Amino acid sequence: MTRNNQSDWSINSWRERPALHQPEYPDKEALREAATELAAFPPLVTSWEVERLKSRLGEAAEGKRFLLQGGDCAEQFQGCDSEVITAKLKILLQMSLVLVQGTRLPVIRVGRLGGQYAKPRSSATETRDGVELPSYFGDIVNRPAFDEASRHPDPWRLLRGYERSALTMNFLRALVSGGFADLHHPEYWDLAWVEHSPRAAEYQEMVMQLSDAVQFMETLTGISVGDLSRVDFFTSHEGLLLEYESALTRSVPRRDGWYNLSTHFPWIGMRTAAPDGAHIEFFSGIRNPIGVKIGPSLEPHEIRSFIEPLIDRLHPDNEPGRLTLIHRYGAAKVADHLPALIEAVRATGRQVLFVCDPMHGNTRTTDAGIKTRRFDDILLELEQSIEIHRNSDSHLGGVHFELTGENVTECTGGARGLTDDDLGQGYRSLVDPRLNYEQALEMALLIAKRIGNHA
Ligand code: PEP
Ligand code: CO
């Protein structure tokens, strides 16, 4: 039984709709076996965690909380490593504290991690020197090396992806439930980069205020800030591979409906969000909060006829926290597109949480052919989004970043002024470029007050 209005929804009803960006597995029998095995494994998250997140997202939609979502474009199996995971949790916790201070709102922290292993690709195949092979679709599908064996979509990797997700979440749960409290104390942060910025004095002042606030609160309550917020960390990934998502979707005792228990908060990518497609069909029947990416491929005058059926399918009951729209228009287009999106949603009479992903509309390729993004474009899209929402009697309720806690060089700009020529020093992403530790922290410092002014 589902709470969804459609009586014909089932865990397999998506199979009757066009499913875009699914790998073509040559061995169908192995796929069936892998999916059957997956369906028997324990879930990675619980329905009560999912419900708790949904109710917090509902409060964010009302302007009472703020969402920080971030992590890799695509996690790699080899990144399932204590340092990589710790660094990512650390930057997200630190950014969240900066945002709490600036916005004066509780911040919901959601990692793009513990399952962000599948990628939609613009082309199903890649050709090099006359050799055509399947594209790399993320580690849960195939391997990046350009040879026949590596690019072969292997259904058993679905199980390897589930296992990596479980290992990651197990470690995260241990970290957030104790021993990580120090990260809330700005005196332990890596702030060497600050002095490279013309805004150094301003940043130092903000960090000092933060430090004082943390100490004040701990003195007042006798509880460490780390302990106060210890359970508030959730996971998300793009709900792309429907074989995987449906195998981990379960009905649970004493609750109505179906929960996708591979993650707390799946989102539907821009390329798979057609209202009559398989992805919307599948996610219309599950109880999790759902994100949908909205990009500039539709013109402003077309957005209404897209949004109406989308919201009817995914958000028929106007349940608080159910639907998040993650707009990713790019700094150059957001002013043209966002007002129309806000109006189109308003016309449906439903409430959604609006989040800005300032990464995916700002991708560019350098002269040397490297995919990158400018720090200032990312900031500009965020600033414009905050302003446009405010002017439209709406509000930006969260931010969605591609970032890492490591010292990579994938995006240009920031306090150290990374240039296109610096990108070769530490470019590790196999897909989209991420903000590094310093750039991510600086971004949080820059946007916190602007969001706060509005709140
Ligand atoms: C992503 O989030 O990595 C992604 C592919 O985004 P979008 O669907 O918005 O292009
Ligand atoms: Co990406």
What are these regions (language model features)?
Residues 74-75, 80-330, 373, 381, ...:
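Active-site-facing alpha/beta catalytic cores
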Residues 294-295, 358-362:
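Conserved phosphate/anionic-ligand binding catalytic regions in large, soluble enzymes, centered on
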Residues 52-54, 276-279, 339-341:
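Glycine-rich, charged/polar anion/phosphate-binding loops
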Residues 2-66:
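N-terminal basic/disordered segments at the start of proteins
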Residues 66-71, 108:
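Short, hydrophobic/glycine-enriched beta-strand segments
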Residues 303-314, 322-353, 360-409:
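Non-transmembrane, aqueous-exposed alpha-helical and coiled segments at domain scale
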Residues 177-178, 182, 352, 356-360:
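An internal, amphipathic alpha-helical element
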Residues 413-416:
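C-terminal structured domain segments
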